[in-house]
């Protein structure tokens, strides 16, 4: 398995042979024997060199994981588990990562000098197994009922906009007034009706925005450009709320909070690297007023 992983990582038999300190014929023979045993072609030749086939990519991800877990077991047996090594692939929404993960990475990476990290930043939900992701930080409801997830926090949602926008459009005095406002809608976020609650009563409102964007950063930019108001998590506008660039309204009404989850790939045990990083993030955000700490582990459900 290690030989195959090195070939995929380097893109050639010769480079893998140099890294493994063996001859190129030995590498070629090992791969041929592996393909014969599995009964599938694992590698294809292209202008970029050797690339894994669809079956090869599936085998590569599992083989890489097995090698990493074996290395971690060796470290644990020798009492060296604190020194995490290898590559940790983390997925998160770009805005959340920029505001709440990246600023905290120095301490984590400083504690694990042998560890490398890759951040896959995308507002869309990606296939963690296909992308080789160790852990993903997701907001809101989880659709994958087979995924293993840990809830790290629940953050409040508010209606907000800039003082300049409200100076022109006026501040809403109740949820029903939102129908008369320009709304910025996040198409990758929560959709549908919003239930506002106050003193036992409930008002349901659907935002009808003319401006829709697929990214949280697009929502932030549009709101800060005075184009309208939005319903958003306070973590998403933490710097702007602190500086007064945006202001919340309808604060005597409450909206459903939004959960922050750490999600692990389906069918895999969480690696020591992933568990350590999730523990670190959970501790780091425990005092964040925009992400009220509320750590709960469970299987993700609808």
Report the location of each language-model feature.
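Short helix-loop hinge/linker segments at domain boundaries
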Residues: 47-50, 57, 68-91
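Flexible hinge/capping segments at coil-to-helix
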Residues: 146-157, 161-184, 199
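Short helix-boundary/capping micro-motifs
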Residues: 6-21
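Central regulatory/effector-binding core of bacterial HTH transcription factors
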Residues: 85-148, 294-302
């Amino acid at each position: 398995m290690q030989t195959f992983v090195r070939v995929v990582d380097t893109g050639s038999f010769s480079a893998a042979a140099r890294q493994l300190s063996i001859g190129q014929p030995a590498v070629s023979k090992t791969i041929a024997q592996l393909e014969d045993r599995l009964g599938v072609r694992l590698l294809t030749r292209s202008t970029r060199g050797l690339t894994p086939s669809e079956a090869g990519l599936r085998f590569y991800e599992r083989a890489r994981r097995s090698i990493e877990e074996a290395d971690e077991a060796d470290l644990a047996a020798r009492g060296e588990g604190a020194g995490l090594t290898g590559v940790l692939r983390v997925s998160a929404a770009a805005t959340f990562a920029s505001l709440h993960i990246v600023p905290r990475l120095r301490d984590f990476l400083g504690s694990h000098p042998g560890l490398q990290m890759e951040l896959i930043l995308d507002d869309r939900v990606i296939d963690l197994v296909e992308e080789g992701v160790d852990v993903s930080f997701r907001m809101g409801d989880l659709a994958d009922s087979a995924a293993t997830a840990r809830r790290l926090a629940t953050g409040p949602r508010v209606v907000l906009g800039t003082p300049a926008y409200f100076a022109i459009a006026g501040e809403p005095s109740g949820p029903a007034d939102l129908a008369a406002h320009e709304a910025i809608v996040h198409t990758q976020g929560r959709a549908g009706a919003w239930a506002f609650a106050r003193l036992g009563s409930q008002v349901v409102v659907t935002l009808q925005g003319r401006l829709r964007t697929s990214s949280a950063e697009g929502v932030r930019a549009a709101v800060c450009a005075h184009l309208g108001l939005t319903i958003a998590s306070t973590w998403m506008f933490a710097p702007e709320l602190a500086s007064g660039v945006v202001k919340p309204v309808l604060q005597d009404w409450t909206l459903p909070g939004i959960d922050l989850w750490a999600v692990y790939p389906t069918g895999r045990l969480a690696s020591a690297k992933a568990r350590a990083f999730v523990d670190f993030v959970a501790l780091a955000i425990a005092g964040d007023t925009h992400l009220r700490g509320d750590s709960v582990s469970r299987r993700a459900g609808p």
